[in-house]
Amino acid sequence: MMMMGEGVSSVPPWSHLPVSGVDVLGGGGGGGDEMTPYVIAALRDYLPANDVGVGADEEEEAAAMAAAVDAYACDEFRMYEFKVRRCARGRSHDWTECPFAHPGEKARRRDPRKYHYSGTACPDFRKGGCKRGDACEYAHGVFECWLHPARYRTQPCKDGTACRRRVCFFAHTPDQLRVLPAQQSSPRSVASSPLAESYDGSPLRRQAFESYLTKTIMSSSPTSTLMSPPKSPPSESPPLSPDGAAAIRRGSWPGVGSPVNDVLASFRQLRLNKVKSSPSGGWSYPSSSAVYGSPKAATGLYSLPTTPLASTATVTTASSFMPNLEPLDLGLIGDEEPVQRVESGRALREKVFERLSRDGAISGDATAFATAGVGLDVDWVSDLIN
């Protein structure tokens, strides 16, 4: 207790300077600097700069959204699910940003796997409405037209990679360009040609295409029997003149009587019967143009063999081609004499000439000549014509 009359002692003011040897953060002296890193590490849990976990969550959410966008942007989803599948979201949202279909939406599409319609725009739908509805075979609206599997990304986009459309129907890179599978060709379009590819349906173009196709098919077969020799095609230079062809069709020649025609008809029928009864007989087409220069072929007659070794008989018809009768292969017959093949129609010839003798059409010498059994030569017919 201070006594009265004593002097007043002055108290110095409080110094704000740190005391030497004392650490403010450590709260004590002597080695306080060693505790500083631990204190800072403890305070880092409360610093606002530590947002590593929050950033990871945002990155995962962004990756999930990107995956969803990629799934919505793939070709399969665009062609078969975009504006086809019903939207399952219950709350109100922007339909233009939603890839799914909504009730009453104009962009709604029919499922191309369920409804078989083409990618061609429906003309009635453009005018205001189509009465056929979902049963229509054409596309209703822009989305059905350009998102159809037959048209989606089959053409390149004019903007390329700089395109900023939310939904683009075209390809931006060569990898995105879709190549449709090759269509099955019809039997009529076997031969590929520029004319066949550019056919537009006009009658003149179709006629030219069929003509081209016929020539291509016939010329591609080296053994085709329908092709005429190149030097003298039947359509350009027929072996027979019109008068000669008409005479053959009428079955008569000027200046020759009817009995001669009967003889020739009998010979022709006899030769045909032999060919039909032979196992190696048949019709064939000429393999060369040598028969076109035959003087006997121009008369329209069968050239009967004058010897047993004759191989071929030719005939010229009114249709401008000359078939060959297959020869009777006498070499394959071992025991049969060739003369017997020539004389097989002797009885028929005797009956024919007996009839001609009664009619007085031929002389008695010719009758004796036929009775003798010698092989007949029809070269005398040319003398009668001349």
Curated annotation (Swiss-Prot):
Q: Where is the composition biased (Low complexity)?
A: 220-229
Q: What's an example GO cellular component term for this entry?
A: nucleus
Mind telling me which PROSITE patterns this protein's record contains? ZF_C3H1 (PS50103)
Gene Ontology biological process terms from the UniProt entry: jasmonic acid mediated signaling pathway; leaf senescence
Q: Does the UniProt entry include the keyword Manganese?
A: no
> Which Gene Ontology MF annotations are present?
DNA binding; zinc ion binding
Top-level taxon: Eukaryota
- C3H1-type zinc finger span: 116-143, 151-175
Query: Biased-composition ranges for Polar residues?
Result: 182-192
Against Gene3D superfamilies, the record matches this protein to: 3.30.1370.210
Q: Does the keyword DNA-binding apply?
A: yes
The UniProt annotation puts the region (Disordered) at 180-200, 220-252
Q: According to its UniProt record, where is this protein located?
A: Nucleus
Bias kind Pro residues: ranges: 230-241
Write out the entry's keywords from A to Z: DNA-binding, Jasmonic acid signaling pathway, Metal-binding, Nucleus, Repeat, Zinc, Zinc-finger
**Job of this protein:** Involved in leaf senescence delay. May repress jasmonic acid (JA) signaling role in promoting leaf senescence. May regulate panicle development and pollination/fertilization process.
PANTHER family assigned: UNKEMPT FAMILY MEMBER (PTHR14493), ZINC FINGER CCCH DOMAIN-CONTAINING PROTEIN 20 (PTHR14493:SF155)
- Protein name per its UniProtKB record: Zinc finger CCCH domain-containing protein 2
- Say which species the protein is native to: Oryza sativa subsp. japonica (Rice)
